[in-house]
Amino acid sequence: MKKITILLLLIVNISLLGYPNQTTYDIVLLDGIIVDGTGKPAKEGALGILDGKMYLLPANTSAESDRIINVSGLVIAPGFVDVHNHTDRSLINPNSNLNEGFIRQGVTTIVGGPDGYLSPVGIQKLKDSLAEHGAGTNVACYIGHNSIRSEVMKNDFKRDATENELNQMRTMVKKGMEMGAVGLSTGLMYTPGSYGNKEEVIALAKEVEPYGGIYDSHVRNPVHDLIGSDREVIEIATSANIGGKIGHLKAVGLQNIGKIRAVIGLVDSARAAGHNIVSDQYPYDGAATTILARIFIIPKEIIQSETLNIEDKVENQFVIILKNLLKDQVIREKIKTVSENGENGGFAWLKATGYTSMRITHSQDFPELVGVYLSQLAEEMNKEPFDAISELLIKANNPVYITLGAIKEQDVQDLMVQSWNMIASDGAYALPGNQGGHPRSTGTFPRVLGHYVRELQILSLEEAIRKMTSMPAKFIGLNTRGQIADGFPADIVVFDPATIIDKSTFVQPNLFSIGVIHVIVNGELVLFEKKITGKKPGKFLKKESFESYKYGE
């Protein structure tokens, strides 16, 4: 490629402005629209990348590089930082560590271990894998309450921890922070964390305070006690004197429609009192998705008598046997009891979210039912809810898909515009062609930029990008990520603001988004002209700062 000569005057200006006094960059992004991640207005400019660092260049730069990429009309933004992401489980496998589904969204850093599921042992495995094999994205992580509680209390977890057990957990939290974790995460809706009381979590949260860590929570009872559960997050964080984040905040279920305004009031009050409370959100009106058969729990004695593999609920064998069992009213009652209450008090989706929170998202046999809540289905059929879903399952020849947590679109929008609310996916590793999963795993960030910024215009481009970049990065202490600034690591996304959009749906959740053109991680192109390069420059990112940040004013 023909090199462009730098004028002597430009060389002088470069040295004065703080970017390298040299003649050749590794990459130059030319004539783009720079949105720097801070919320400041977009401006025309160029970006030079050298030795993994970025440097702002004038819009009419003559900077020299062997790789000059013209990005006229495209947005140059910091790579997106996904603060609630589950792909860490896949990134330790060299066969699944490209993380293409997130690269194609513009994500350059994921924060793994949310919902309480990463122990010091897990963190070490993650660090070792990244050091040896790399990844398509950078990875930071939380230290997880569920994992350490499980390691300390084993199967005897349905009780309060003893002082000795609590001390063991404290030690593990400190170890996780010393390994570079950004804070403590909990999944208080799930076992064994659900058996830990507020005082236990406060004690553990206090251990991250000396490290400048934060508290991130999948709240305890988001459907049946939305306000109380979100208030608990605030109480834990403020008691530990650390920042607190309500993970994937939403108002799920018919009974909670409109209550997001009350939660917004709680957060606003806490912030007005000087507490660093924030939230993250994915831009969809439904939470986790599954097939209807998955919410049924068959009692163990019946499983044993049927020699049924309960671990593989998508197999035809399971559905066929389940349908036959439900035709027997005596057995149906037994299945109802454990499905609605959990076996021996354990977890059950019908107990956690309930019929008023589950909505049908796809049915090949009964398309007219799409959008209907299971509680509404029961009313229409004039049956008890469990009988209604049993009859639907029996009659359907093809899988019926549901969301386990339906959300009203107005509540999604009311939360999205709050200055302290971040964008995050809650997504997992996406495999094209796989029917399972949720569209958030391939569509979260482009959906915000395409649907909520370009189409609905409820957010400005600059504000949306702030919510995806500098705000999450600063909150968790990755202070040189999430912002375009001289000398910062070159994590960059280049996208077309006119075309970026998600393509995945609840029916086809693993379709890749469009509109992201180039992605750079630590100075290396992982996506070039919409094509995956195969490079894996991602690394483990330790918390950089011990300061406490309050964003969103």
Regions found by a protein language model. Give the residues of each.
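Divalent metal-coordination and catalytic microenvironments
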Residues: 32, 47, 52, 73, ...
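Acidic, glycine-enriched loop/beta-strand segments at the rims
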Residues: 34-46, 400-406, 410-412, 456-465, ...
